[in-house]
Amino acid sequence: LPIYYDEIALDYCSAGCWSEAAGLWNVAITEGSVTPMTYYYLGWCLTQGKLSGAEQALADAAQACSDYCFPNRLEAILALQCAMEQNPNDAKAPYYLGNLYYDKRQYDLALEAWETSAKLDDKFPTIWRNLALANFNKKNEEARAIEYMERAFRLDKTDARVLMELDQLYKRVRRSHAERLAFLQQYPELIAQRDDLVLEEITLLNQTGEYEKAKTLLDAHIFHPWEGGEGKVPGQYQFARVELAKKALEAGNYSQAIPLLEECLEYPHHLGEGKLYGAQENDFYYFMGCAYEGLGQSDKAAECWEQAIVGPTEPAAAMYYNDAKPDKIFYQGLALLKLGRMDEANGRFHKLTS
């Protein structure tokens, strides 16, 4: 691995053994075990040791593929600064240096380095993406961040991650659901590459009242677990079905509402996660009871409403996806009203307003 060559060669550099270090990096190049930093380190080493070949090494560094290159060592700062001095037209050296500074929370230095890189090469999408995130997160420059992220996406409309990040910026600046949905749906091939983009489209469909489309899209996609996504897919799965069930109840199609609500109680495999112990299902059972009531099946309706009053009764902040949600208490109250237990129902409602 390139890192092993770097470790030993940098030890040689620390001892002032520039020729030996350069020899080791040349072995790495011969073996094909390289990253762009291999060439930057070699160029810096040759410069420090006043050896020949530094100019060629730094030229090779500037042309090397930048994919997955994330310098993180303190020595990398010296090597990249050397490259910026010796080869001032190299746009990648300040880009890598900005990445390193940002990782070390030196945000002003990172922005300065990235801006230098952008001036040297304004056709590199990632530099605009990085500048967008830094301006939004560290400078609160919303308009500039969006301008830069849009530029990054225009430069490479095959990058699904940048599409996702651009949409997230639109969400943060409160673009309308309809506008965001129309934008995303221009790129179905990119959406299909990422579960989070598929979920975002489904969420926007639900938020714009397109429940049937949301349900169809969600049911056709196989999701995979990802950190930070816990509970989001089942949430939209259930939301679409509850809203469709409510529409069926309003139209008097009670038998149509029941299977939709029953589906909310089961998590099919394609959601990518299972139902947690103690999941609150008050609203599902409340509406199911209403459907059975509409069909004249009062016993089944009462059974559903009894299920709907089960669960925590004290409102609390829902900080995590698996925390008890206070709005479920509202449906407990509605179910208690249906059961004729007025005092208990008012007690639930009072807790939500006191």
Indicate residue ranges for each PLM-predicted region.
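Flexible helix-coil transition and linker loops at the boundaries of alpha-helical arrays
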Residues: 67-69, 81-86, 186-190, 224-234, ...
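Position-specific recognition of the canonical hydrophobic site in helix A of tetratricopeptide repeat
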Residues: 13, 47, 102, 136-137, ...
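Single-residue signature of alpha-solenoid repeat helices
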Residues: 21, 54, 76, 110, ...
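Residue-level recognition of tetratricopeptide repeat
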Residues: 10, 44, 99, 133-134, ...
